[in-house]
Amino acid sequence: PAVWGYCMWRKYHDGIADTELISGRELLRREPNFNEKTRFAISNPDSGCVCPYGLTIAYAENAVQNGARIALNTAVLGMDVADGRITAVHTNRGTLHPALVINAAGVFAEDVARMADDRFFSIHPRRGTNSILDRKAGAFMHSIASVKGNDMVSKTHSKGGGILHTVHDNLLIGPDAVETYEKENTATYPESIAHVFSKQKITMPALTERDIITYFTGVRAPTFEEDFIIERGRHTHNLIHVAGIQSPGLTTAPAV
């Protein structure tokens, strides 16, 4: 009943129309290398994956085609605010006088909000480590999978990492979630990789660290409300905040 209820919640409350509940036997028919002890699975057959950095580059190229200018190696150092409006943005390469400022600065979004006299949220950085496996491991599965226990359904705001068959036929494993005070701490630690594998082996026991070809760590930018902030400035009128996006940012980008 609990699994069925969660499935129906995703289908009708969250609006994920292709959500279906399948038996462990059907899951193993589709993915023979999954854990044979699995009793049920929630399937979304319409889901898929893209190349994240390829799509990001394509977004940037499309923006330039539509008149955007990209300023690389440019840091915002401060802002002038008068009468509820940002009148100047000071950078290490000069000063801009904007009509509108969009605060999409990730882990630095609260710093930008502070410069604009419009800070009403806080960011607490959260590291996440991914491992990429050799293509031979890509033959183990052909979908996107994660394990989610009953405790995770009620206590977390994410799927808790997973296993992804990439567009390049590798497997991507992760990420984990580790709170950090360092906004740019992209170091990768052995315990993070070990934790990710110990969890994802519940889904696919055949996973092995020997197949890792590379790994990397990113830093999410959650708020304490664990939700997106997409709204106009509350005190500064020519400001729009796009903060607290976290991991789903790539997927939600078209809607955002």
Could you say what each language-model-derived stretch is?
Residues 33-38, 80-87, 96, 222-226, ...:
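A short, glycine/Asx- and small/polar-enriched loop/turn
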Residues 71, 102, 240-242:
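Hydrophobic/aromatic beta-strand patches that form the interior of the parallel beta-sheet core
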Residues 58, 158, 166-168, 179-256:
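C-terminal catalytic lobe of FAD-dependent flavoproteins
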Residues 18-20, 69, 211, 238:
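Conserved beta-strand segments of alpha/beta enzyme cores
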Residues 79-174, 178-189, 195-198, 204-207:
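Flavin-dependent oxidoreductases
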Residues 42-100:
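Helical element adjacent to the flavin cofactor pocket in flavoenzyme catalytic cores
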Residues 23, 72-74, 214:
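Short loop/edge segments at beta-strand edges and connector loops
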Residues 1-30, 158-161:
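Dinucleotide-binding Rossmann-like beta1-alpha1 core, especially the glycine-rich loop
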